């Protein structure tokens, strides 16, 4: 498949469907390993940040299959098993987003795959392993969720801030973010519908796209955490920026994603936190 063809809508759609199958296969591997998983096989990358052989096995599988689909693309991956140099397009892969959830048998956790060219996100696929939901989008094509034979378009919710369900995640860099999360909870607790923390950036974004959450904010995260989900939110009618309010968020470490209606309120809060 030639690079220039990727900008044709049908080519993007067809490639997205193929990436969904890759994500499902990786998800099936993760699901099967969970039944015999032992915490003794967990490694600590940093404080409160873990990796298992399952993360690495999933990444190896995904990288191999994506190379077959698009040999000319490079990779940005969480576990660093594949790299990039001067390729025009890059796969951005989180082989298991929500590793801590996985270790504890606590849903959700997911496979996240995006394709980018420069600062443009062309494809986003997130497969939630427990519920077997595949969320996906391609640039200009809308966003969808598929479970079994059932496929539905995604649309963000319509709640205003007083009724909104917010997701305020806790990143691994807890010392740096502790004063921020305290201020955010103080600002919103009792002033919104409710607040959740779900342990997966990719799934928080997909839940915003599906209208299950109205907003999500997190800092000190990697591109692999948010890239696929960000496109899904935008294609579902939502808004995504960094903590500074810039729409150019793809090289940063912060994300604010909302239904649009509550964006300015949440953005003001994170700026002042």
Predicted regions and their residues:
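N-terminal subdomain of lithium-sensitive/metallo-dependent phosphomonoesterases centered on the IMPase/IPPase/PAP
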Residues: 2-96, 247, 261, 268-271
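Residue-level signal for inorganic ion chemistry
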Residues: 30, 55, 66, 99, ...
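Short amphipathic alpha-helical face segments that pack within enzyme cores
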Residues: 61, 110, 228-231
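Short coil/turn connectors at secondary-structure junctions
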Residues: 71, 87-88, 119-122, 162-163, ...
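DPxDG-like acidic metal-binding loop motif
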Residues: 85-144
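Hydrophobic/proline-rich hinge and linker segments of small-molecule sensing/allosteric domains
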Residues: 143-146, 166
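An extended, acidic
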Residues: 154-273
